[in-house]
């Protein structure tokens, strides 16, 4: 199972995704924005397999977070969540081997499948 860092400024999304992925046996750490997520990534001993982040967040958006996170931890898999197609198109231009995106709204089964795909 994976250790996942989840960044989303929407508390309801954070809770739903955390519960869904935890029920599959994953360890999920939640943060409320990109700055907090970046701090968690840089913490001593922090080891994450996957970063799942909303694209549209205040202070540090998800694409900028992904770029900074990958500079720190190049092996990190990244899943970007967004309800805006243009944001996901911008994200697709990132040259990252393990980058997936999911459009909001999504079902819990869909987010679980994305995580399975990343881990495959």
Label the model's feature ranges.
Residues 32-36, 61-65:
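Acidic catalytic/metal-coordinating carboxylates
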């Amino acid at each position: 199972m994976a250790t996942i860092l989840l960044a989303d400024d929407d508390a309801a999304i954070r809770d739903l995704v955390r519960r869904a992925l935890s029920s599959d046996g994953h360890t999920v750490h939640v943060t409320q924005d990109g700055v907090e997520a970046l701090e968690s990534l840089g913490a001593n001993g922090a080891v994450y397999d996957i970063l799942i982040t909303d694209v549209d967040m205040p202070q540090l958006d998800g694409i900028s977070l992904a770029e900074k996170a990958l500079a720190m931890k190049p092996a990190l898999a990244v899943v970007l969540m967004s309800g805006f197609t243009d944001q996901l198109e911008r994200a697709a231009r990132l040259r990252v081997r393990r980058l997936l995106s999911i459009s909001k709204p999504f079902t819990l089964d869909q987010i679980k499948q994305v995580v399975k795909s990343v881990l495959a």
